[in-house]
Amino acid sequence: KARALKITEELDRTMEVPKPVRMHWTGCPNTCAQVQVADIGFMGCMTRDENKKVVEGVDIFIGGRVGADSHLGDLIHKGVPCKDVVPVVQELLIKHFGAIRKTNM
């Protein structure tokens, strides 16, 4: 939970997003936070970093929604080390949600 808040705060500090983006986070393999129905979903996992060390990471899903036009999000990035999540999500926000980088950081 603390990691999700820290990443979200960094995204808020660095990005201007024109509309709300629903981000769901879970460490539960049963997807208790329903990451597949979020605009961007993060499912905790163990992965390897650039030095092949086992670290905490996330699988990233995008495009989920509920309602009449329901759709499960697609797995777009698998095993992203947590330290690398912010730049990956910044690019997703730009590409899929019309976000821009803030210049007055």
UniProtKB/Swiss-Prot annotation:
The UniProt note on the cofactor reads as follows:
Binds 1 siroheme per subunit. Binds 1 [4Fe-4S] cluster per subunit.
Q: What class of enzyme is it?
A: oxidoreductase
The reply to whether DNA damage figures as a keyword in the UniProt entry is no
Tree of life domain: Eukaryota
| InterPro entries from the UniProt entry | NIR_SIR_4Fe-4S, NO2/SO3_Rdtase_4Fe4S_dom, NO2/SO3_Rdtase_4Fe4S_sf, NO2/SO3_Rdtase_FeS/sirohaem_BS
| Tissues of expression | Highest expression in roots and hypocotyls. Some expression in cotyledonary whorls.
Q: What is its EC number?
A: 1.7.7.1
Q: Which cofactor does it need?
A: siroheme; [4Fe-4S] cluster
Q: Which PROSITE patterns match?
A: NIR_SIR
- For this chain's UniProt record, which GO biological process terms are given? nitrate assimilation
Pathway as given in its UniProt record: Nitrogen metabolism; nitrate reduction (assimilation)
Query: What does the record give as the reaction this protein catalyses?
Result: 6 oxidized [2Fe-2S]-[ferredoxin] + NH4(+) + 2 H2O = nitrite + 6 reduced [2Fe-2S]-[ferredoxin] + 8 H(+)
**Any one GO cellular component localisation term in the record:** chloroplast
Any one Gene Ontology MF annotation carried by this entry is: ferredoxin-nitrite reductase activity
Q: Give residues annotated as binding siroheme.
A: 32
Per UniProt, the keywords (alphabetical) are: 4Fe-4S, Chloroplast, Heme, Iron, Iron-sulfur, Metal-binding, Nitrate assimilation, Oxidoreductase, Plastid
The entry marks the following residues as binding [4Fe-4S] cluster, namely 28, 32
- What do we know about what induces or represses this protein's expression? Strong induction by nitrate in roots and hypocotyls. Strong induction by light and weak induction by nitrate in cotyledonary whorls.
UniProt similarity note: Belongs to the nitrite and sulfite reductase 4Fe-4S domain family.
The subunit structure is: Monomer.
Its name, as the record gives it, is Ferredoxin--nitrite reductase, chloroplastic
- Give the organism the record lists: Pinus sylvestris
Upper classification of the organism: Eukaryota, Viridiplantae, Streptophyta, Embryophyta, Tracheophyta
- The gene is NIR
